[in-house]
């Protein structure tokens, strides 16, 4: 039996008595970085193949600069334990990224390739108990999770590629995303967990389903009853300001074009504290009901996520949605179904346009093509880029 297939507690014992440990390359094939469009403070993320399961995964490993020379656990080290515990508690939600494995590696290179590894897989308790031991040894924590397509990252999709470009989600999709996100917060708050780190970089959306990543900065409040109500209100505030405002307007809450938000512990705490008024002047077509609801959240006039959900459902009925407590007209309901079908076809059409453009680009780099054919291919690429720059759905 290979050491990489042994239980983590046996491998840990092997480590303690000085026997051979499994190598990183026995468990994972590490590929390229996949976080370059939105770098984080705590960790780097690489594509990897789990050689035990055959799954393609995202391999998230703590940045080497967060190792302490004295073997102490800095906040960034503890954050991996915090994330592991919260992911385990929320694992039944369809809206969080799936996790597969937690563990530690000895390689201190930013992009690890070699060295030893201890894998706890889904044994979160064992991983948490081992944190201090492997911090003292100078090993870095890692976790693996499902590798979500970059094409589903809202920040990647909505980030402008020219000074005058800006995209927003259609209101139908924005409402669907907001309902799923607030449902996730409702589940988390029921477990005394606040997410806090709301930004587009952490939001993945395929037009139907929401996935949220990065729970490093999330917090459990079980020993802080006095502050809990304020923290729940702040979580709703951060969702309205940091995610929903941007996806409905295509703008940063700092009243600039979209840009990466700072991600250190201190930055997460302070990121939106001074934002209590949202500017919707650049998106006059946005429903007044949506704008008013988000403004109430920004002003912290919504104290619980359930209050936000109730308000969101009332607003959504004006867009053809139907709920047990809030009704819409039959005509609006039918029109919404037609709009949903149209948006689905629109997404498919835009994807076909991208595929056509990429085929033309590949043809352009062929050696020996005629000048006339080259000119026509360039013309088509330019026209399709213009179509995509003016697309309806990010």
Regions from the PLM with identified roles:
Residues 177-178:
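Activation segment signature within eukaryotic-like protein kinase domains
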Residues 100-168:
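Conserved structural core of kinase catalytic domains
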Residues 202-214:
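Conserved protein kinase catalytic/activation segment
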Residues 188-205:
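Catalytic-loop of the protein kinase fold
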Residues 298-322:
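Terminal C-lobe "cap" of eukaryotic-type protein kinase domains
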Residues 42-88, 96-97, 101, 105-111:
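ATP-binding glycine-rich loop module of kinase domains
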Residues 211, 215-286:
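C-lobe/activation-segment region of protein kinase-like
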């Amino acid at each position: 039996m290979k050491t990489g297939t042994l239980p983590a507690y046996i491998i840990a014992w092997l480590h303690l008595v000085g026997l051979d440990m499994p190598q990183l390359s026995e468990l994972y094939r590490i590929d390229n970085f996949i976080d370059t469009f939105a770098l984080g403070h705590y960790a780097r993320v690489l594509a990897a193949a789990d050689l035990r399961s055959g799954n393609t995964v995202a391999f998230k490993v703590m940045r080497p600069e967060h190792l302490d020379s004295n073997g102490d656990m800095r906040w960034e080290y503890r954050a991996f334990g915090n994330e592991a515990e919260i992911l385990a508690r929320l694992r039944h939600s369809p809206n969080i990224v799936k996790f597969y494995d937690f563990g530690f590696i000895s390689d201190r290179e930013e992009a690890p390739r070699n060295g030893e590894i201890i894998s706890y897989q889904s044994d979160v308790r064992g991983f948490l108990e081992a944190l201090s031991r492997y911090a003292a040894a100078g090993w870095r924590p890692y976790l693996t999770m499902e590798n979500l397509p970059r094409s589903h990252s809202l920040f990647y999709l909505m980030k402008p590629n020219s000074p005058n470009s800006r995209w927003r989600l259609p209101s139908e999709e924005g409402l669907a995303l907001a309902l799923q996100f607030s449902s996730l917060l409702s589940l988390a708050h029921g477990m005394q967990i606040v997410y806090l780190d709301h930004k587009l970089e952490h939001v993945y959306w395929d037009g139907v389903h929401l996935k949220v990543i990065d729970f490093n900065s999330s917090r459990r409040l079980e020993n802080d009853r006095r502050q809990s109500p304020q923290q729940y209100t702040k979580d709703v505030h951060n969702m309205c300001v940091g995610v929903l405002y941007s996806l409905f307007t295509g703008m940063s809450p700092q009243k600039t074009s979209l840009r990466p938000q700072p991600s250190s512990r201190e930055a997460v705490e302070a990121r939106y504290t001074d934002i209590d008024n949202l500017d919707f002047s650049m998106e006059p077509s946005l429903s007044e009901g949506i704008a008013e609801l988000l403004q109430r959240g920004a002003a912290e006039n919504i104290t619980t996520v359930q209050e936000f959900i109730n308000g969101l459902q009332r607003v959504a009925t004006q867009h053809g949605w139907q709920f047990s407590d809030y009704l819409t007209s039959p005509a609006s309901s039918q029109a919404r179904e037609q709009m949903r079908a149209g948006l689905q076809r629109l997404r498919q059409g835009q994807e076909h346009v991208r595929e056509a453009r990429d085929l033309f680009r590949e043809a352009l780099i062929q050696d020996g093509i005629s000048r006339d054919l080259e000119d026509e291919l360039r013309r088509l690429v330019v026209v399709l880029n213009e179509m995509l720059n003016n697309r309806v759905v990010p």
